[in-house]
Amino acid sequence: MKTPNTKMNVESFNLDHTKVKAPYVRIADRKKGINGDLIVKYDVRFKQPNQEHMDMPSLHSLEHLVAEIIRNHANYVVDWSPMGCQTGFYLTVLNHDNYTEILEVLEKTMQDVLKATEVPASNEKQCGWAANHTLEGAKNLAHAFLSKRDEWSEIGI
């Protein structure tokens, strides 16, 4: 078993979660493909690690909303995935490396979440846990995240 000081294969396992200050958006990883494609993964942290977390229905609904809406603002988005610790999401993009633009896209997306009238694909045909959604909860998360927009670049460390 590896100790806390041993370098791990997973980038986020090497992040000292006691030294970050949520909410924030940070570049978690960059990978170059053999043909020159660039994959950039962002750590989009909503809650302070080990102190608070998102409840599952709200997180689940925000996942659906952002996954659908963000693509209206950026065609380079590959994925928007929740973290198992329920403190944030990973945003993965292809051939795009402009941090400032990512912040703008996230801001526009969260503003659109606040205007949403339903959670997309929140039915049994399109979702594996359709009963586990709350539009109000997702909007509350988006509102809280947006209210600290000026802090997104302040990671702590």
Swiss-Prot record:
It catalyses: S-(5-deoxy-D-ribos-5-yl)-L-homocysteine = (S)-4,5-dihydroxypentane-2,3-dione + L-homocysteine. Binds 1 Fe cation per subunit. GO terms for molecular function: iron ion binding; S-ribosylhomocysteine lyase activity. It is an enzyme of class 4 (lyase). InterPro entries: LuxS_sf, Metalloenz_LuxS/M16, S-ribosylhomocysteinase. The keyword Metal-binding applies. Its EC number is 4.4.1.21. Fe cation binds at H60, H64, C127. Keywords: Autoinducer synthesis, Iron, Lyase, Metal-binding, Quorum sensing. Its cofactor is Fe cation. GO terms for biological process: quorum sensing. Pfam families: LuxS. Belongs to the LuxS family. Homodimer. Involved in the synthesis of autoinducer 2 (AI-2) which is secreted by bacteria and is used to communicate both the cell density and the metabolic potential of the environment. The regulation of gene expression in response to changes in cell density is called quorum sensing. Catalyzes the transformation of S-ribosylhomocysteine (RHC) to homocysteine (HC) and 4,5-dihydroxy-2,3-pentadione (DPD). PANTHER family: S-RIBOSYLHOMOCYSTEINE LYASE. This is S-ribosylhomocysteine lyase. It comes from Helicobacter acinonychis (strain Sheeba).
